[in-house]
Amino acid sequence: MAANFLKSLFGEEDIDEQDGLYETSEQVSTPANTSNKVVSINSGRLNQMSQISLYEPRLYADVKQIASQLLEGHAVIVNFTQMDANVAARLVDFLNGTVFAIDGEMKRIGKEIFLCTPKNYEISGSLTSNLKNDGDKF
């Protein structure tokens, strides 16, 4: 009944004209020699070793090498005890900007010692209860 309604609505000639518009497609055969390769997501990580670099800068110019390590994806521990307080404060500001740019993290782990990490490191725990503000330089 629905077919008759459609025939009367569109006309039988219209339906016959449209029948020739669609061709049957041939089945595409896939090559028999394809192999399904399974690659572990963590396979690249197993071969890479994480690295933490230790620095005790004496000049502001040393910040370039420290920032380069962060940009390469390495964590950095920086001891500022051998620096002038004003220069150390500038260096901390520079490293803070570098860490922010790479979406990393910077934590104080000693009176004048900082840990800077890139995004792929996680810092857990807190040492702030052991640190006292005894006139810190920065």
Curated annotation (Swiss-Prot):
A Gene Ontology term for the protein's cellular component: cytoplasm
The species this protein was found in: Limosilactobacillus reuteri (strain DSM 20016) (Lactobacillus reuteri)
GO BP annotations, alphabetical order: division septum assembly; FtsZ-dependent cytokinesis
Annotated protein name in UniProt: Cell division protein SepF
Entry keyword set: Cell cycle, Cell division, Cytoplasm, Septation
Subunit and interaction comment: Homodimer. Interacts with FtsZ.
HAMAP family xrefs: SepF
Family statement drawn from the similarity comment of this UniProt entry: Belongs to the SepF family.
Its job: Cell division protein that is part of the divisome complex and is recruited early to the Z-ring. Probably stimulates Z-ring formation, perhaps through the cross-linking of FtsZ protofilaments. Its function overlaps with FtsA.
InterPro entries to which the protein is assigned, alphabetical: Cell_div_SepF (IPR023052), Cell_div_SepF/SepF-rel (IPR007561), SepF-like_sf (IPR038594)
Origin: domain of life: Bacteria
Annotated localization: Cytoplasm
Chief localization: cytoplasm
